[in-house]
A protein has these predicted regions:
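Short acidic linear motifs
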Residues: 2-472
């Protein structure tokens, strides 16, 4: 069977149209790819431009802002006075079993009585056994009394989130040793040792110094809170703890800009992380989790410069907020605008919430320390006049240069005389101002409690009866 002349004539035309269609599709794909590449490069170049401007802005405001310059400018203590040097020695001298006994259920509810209530005899006996096993560590820890500051070099991991701070974290162990040393010194009537170990406990916190990471400063805040708590306990258990040196040290430490130390360092560390992401030293997946193996995932890298610029500007705004007086910091942080609603700006979008969480801890612990300074002044007033002051202004200037301000309001801290003692307190983060009580262990408002002499050193409550085995 033969094709008709008409069919033979139309076949070449069909092939021409097919070729044109294929060519059009190929051209469209080429154009689409070119558009994607151009858009990718445009995003990257726009980000690089913003990053250049952001880096210039922060350099004008803070010339030593990079990780290298910031650390080079940190102050180092004189030789022999660096508290940070003692921490690894104390750790090495501590028994590996330290703290394991107190982790048992039998002690769970009896390790945090009211400050004016004695620890139970079995708790004290266990503390003696533990301290005896780590006697060399305790002797080393007491030397911190003479080392009111500290410095250690921090080596950032390529992924800065994985930076190890072993010695910094071991400061918590040092605090644990010293708090029990304070407790047993009071039990033994060794008031000088109790006072020295209280100052050493505060200096354990200060050994962290200006370490430029949030984790470091959170540890410093936590250990300082332990020092405040055991200062409260010492005054509630003993009538004659020496106070002037401790008050001066706490007053100085209460004004340390711990939030600023951490925020400046985190800005520098975050910028180092971005640099490692852009250069491929750290895979993006290591920070953001698994990324899609498609165009969307590929575009993430083009957005890194803009994300970096946004993070740098936001962290710089946080640094400027942290430079303000404490009571102005919360409004300054709240005024920082939200980043653009861009799903590619993943890292910069999380910066402010992290700073705010650390700031809350900073304001709370600063309020605690300021309350402690005033509380010590109140106790010194009582020792001299045999009564509590009628108002905090009565402490000035003999016992205080001025009444410290509440970090939450900028107004002077509050004071209340109660039937069983007195309390210095802050309004707290909720601004409720209900910290003026002595006996509530659930009240979380920053405060420092003081008991009348006849209410101090109350006996420990009876030990809980052992649970009976159920009948067979």
């Amino acid at each position: 069977m033969h094709d008709s002349p008409a069919r033979r004539k139309t076949r070449p035309g069909r092939w021409r149209w097919a070729k044109r269609l294929v060519a059009a599709v190929v051209l469209g794909l080429v154009c689409a790819c070119a558009w994607v590449l151009v858009a990718h490069e445009r995003v990257r170049l726009d980000g690089e431009h913003e990053l250049t401007e952001a880096r210039a802005e922060v350099t004008d405001a803070d010339p030593d802002w990079t990780w290298e310059k910031l650390n080079a400018a940190r102050k180092k203590p004189p030789a022999g006075l660096n508290g940070a040097d003692l921490v690894p020695e104390i750790k090495a001298a501590t028994e590996p079993e330290w703290g394991q006994a107190f982790a048992r259920d039998e002690f769970a509810s009896r390790l945090d009585p009211l400050p004016n209530v004695q620890f139970a005899p079995d708790v004290l006996a266990q503390a003696r056994r533990d301290l005896k096993g780590s006697a060399d560590a305790v002797r080393l820890a007491r030397q911190l009394k003479h080392r009111p500051t500290g410095h250690r070099e921090i080596e950032l991991a390529p992924n800065v989130v994985g930076t190890l701070l072993v010695d910094t974290q071991n400061t918590r162990l040092v605090a644990d040793l010293l708090r029990w040393d304070v407790t047993l010194a009071i039990e033994d009537g060794d008031i000088r040792r109790a006072s020295d170990s209280l100052l050493a406990l505060l200096n354990a916190s200060r050994s962290i110094g200006d370490e430029p990471l949030f984790v470091s400063q959170l540890v410093r805040m936590a250990v300082r809170s332990v020092a405040v708590r055991y200062t409260e306990l010492a005054l509630a258990q003993s009538p004659s703890v020496p106070l002037i040196e401790l008050q001066a040290a706490l007053a100085a430490d209460a004004e340390e800009p711990l939030l600023l130390y951490g925020t400046r360092g985190e800005r520098a560390a975050l910028d180092r992380l971005f640099d490692n992401l852009q250069t491929g030293v750290v895979p993006l997946e290591e920070v953001l989790g698994p990324r899609p193996k498609n165009l969307w995932g590929w575009q993430d890298h083009a957005h890194l410069p803009m994300d970096r610029a946004t993070a740098l500007r936001r962290m710089t705004a946080c640094v400027e907020a942290a430079r303000r007086p404490l009571h102005e910091q919360a409004p300054a942080l709240a005024a920082i605008p939200e980043p653009p609603a861009d799903p590619h700006l993943v890292i910069s979008g999380a910066t402010l919430s992290t700073v705010e969480n650390v700031a809350q801890a900073f304001w709370r612990t600063s309020a605690q320390a300021r309350c402690a300074v005033v509380g010590i002044a109140c106790e010194r007033f009582r020792q001299q006049h045999r009564r509590w002051p009628g108002a905090l202004t009565a402490l000035v200037p003999a016992f205080l240069p001025a009444v410290p301000l509440d970090p939450y309001t900028g107004e002077p801290l509050q004071f209340a005389k109660l039937e069983s003692g007195a309390v210095v307190y802050s309004v707290g983060s909720d601004r409720r101002g209900d910290g003026g009580t002595l006996d509530s262990v659930s009240n979380t408002a920053p405060r420092f409690r003081l008991w009348n002499p006849d209410q101090r050193r109350r006996p420990a409550p009876p030990a809980p009866a052992p649970e009976r085995e159920p009948p067979p």
